[in-house]
């Protein structure tokens, strides 16, 4: 009996020693890691700090990191970016939300720092290397996108000019995808001029100037899209999205790897609803996207562009032809609409659509207000 008790005590003692040895070993490894970080000229971020964790109203936990498949929607303003993001927002698994406005500004600053040799030298000398800046940009952009709206399985950002930085963003977020909204530049320019959408660098009193600036902006974005590659960047033609919404959205969701939902065809029914489409009262497209997809804005520009500009169109905006638009057609033949779009258009012309309760009375009061976008050099 005494021998048996001794064996039990001996076994318990050995187990205790083993546990203490394991704990001591773990502490030694942790101390080494800390000391290595202290000796290193740059501290290392712990892996768990690289993820954002958010809990939705449904008590589901969402984890976001640099490897997540973010969606970036952009293009020249007045090219259908708001319609595109509203359609995506209608999907139960996607959240885009309003324009952040700050992301394209920060991207422009980052680009300016890298372009200036003197500034880059100063930053490098101060230890603010490209690696440091990129890590900060990555964290900042992810934080803004994730926290400016409700969490969702798939996050999307819509700031028109972000797609001037598609190559850089694809480096920060390697699994991200991009939707470049493309629209007939004549329609985009007519819309920004008549709706007084101020964009830095665009002279809204001149069709010629605005078309020249449109050409420069879409040229940069299209080149970035091509460089990123067809597997990651999809040009989406506004006209085709409006004429054939079901066909276009099936292609878009397939490209994004997102399952089909009929809700994307009826974004107007989900405006202002929980988990639906949130609209900003200060974005100039809001009064249009509360309506079902319709033909109202497709060819409004015809007959309004000055004759000398129409005559020189191919030289002023060569990107029109490159994107497949006929610079001399007034109006071009964009194609025949689906029956549902014809029906929607008839409803809109009769005023047969609902204004969300939170926006009622707003459009009458603010119809003459302006909205601005940050352009870039």
From Swiss-Prot:
The active site is at residue 99. InterPro entries: P-loop_NTPase, TPST-like. GO terms for cellular component: Golgi membrane. It is found in: Golgi apparatus membrane. It is a single-pass type II membrane protein. Glycans are attached at residues 343, 368. GO terms for molecular function: protein-tyrosine sulfotransferase activity. 3'-phosphoadenylyl sulfate binds at residues 78-82, 183, 191, 195, 238, 285-294, 300. Residues 1-8 are cytoplasmic. Belongs to the protein sulfotransferase family. This is Protein-tyrosine sulfotransferase 2. The gene is TPST2.
């Amino acid at each position: 009996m005494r021998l048996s008790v001794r064996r039990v005590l001996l076994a318990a003692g050995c187990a205790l020693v083993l546990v203490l040895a394991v704990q001591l070993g773990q502490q030694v490894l942790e101390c080494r890691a800390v000391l290595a970080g202290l000796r290193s000229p740059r501290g290392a971020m712990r892996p768990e700090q690289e993820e954002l964790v958010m809990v939705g109203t449904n008590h589901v936990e969402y984890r976001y990191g640099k490897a997540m498949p973010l969606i970036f929607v952009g293009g020249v303003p007045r090219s259908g970016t708001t319609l595109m993001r509203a359609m995506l927002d209608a999907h139960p698994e996607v959240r885009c939300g309003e324009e952040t406005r700050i992301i394209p500004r920060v991207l422009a600053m980052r680009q300016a720092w890298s372009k200036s040799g003197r500034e880059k030298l100063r930053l490098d000398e101060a230890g603010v290397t490209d690696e440091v800046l990129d890590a900060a940009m990555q964290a900042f952009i992810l934080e803004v996108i994730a926290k400016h709206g409700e969490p969702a399985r798939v996050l999307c950002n819509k700031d028109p000019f972000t797609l001037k930085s598609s190559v850089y963003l694809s480096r920060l977020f390697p699994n991200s995808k991009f939707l470049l909204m493309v629209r007939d530049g004549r329609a985009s320019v007519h819309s920004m001029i008549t709706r007084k959408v101020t964009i830095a660098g665009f002279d809204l009193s001149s069709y010629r100037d605005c078309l020249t600036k449109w050409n420069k902006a879409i040229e940069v974005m299209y080149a970035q899209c091509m460089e990123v590659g067809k597997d990651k960047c999809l040009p989406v033609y506004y006209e085709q999205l409006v004429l054939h919404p079901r066909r276009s959205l099936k292609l878009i969701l397939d490209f994004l790897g997102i399952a089909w939902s009929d809700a994307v065809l009826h974004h107007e029914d989900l405006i202002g609803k929980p988990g639906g489409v949130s609209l900003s009262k200060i974005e100039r497209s809001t009064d249009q996207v509360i309506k079902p997809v319709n033909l109202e804005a497709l060819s409004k520009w015809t007959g309004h562009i000055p004759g000398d500009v129409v005559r020189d169109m191919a030289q002023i905006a060569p990107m029109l032809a490159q994107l497949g638009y006929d610079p001399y057609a007034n109006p071009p033949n964009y194609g025949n609409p689906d029956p549902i779009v014809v029906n929607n258009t008839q409803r809109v012309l009769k005023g047969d659509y609902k204004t969300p309760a939170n926006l009622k009375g707003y459009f009458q009061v603010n119809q003459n207000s302006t909205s601005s976008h940050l352009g870039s050099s």
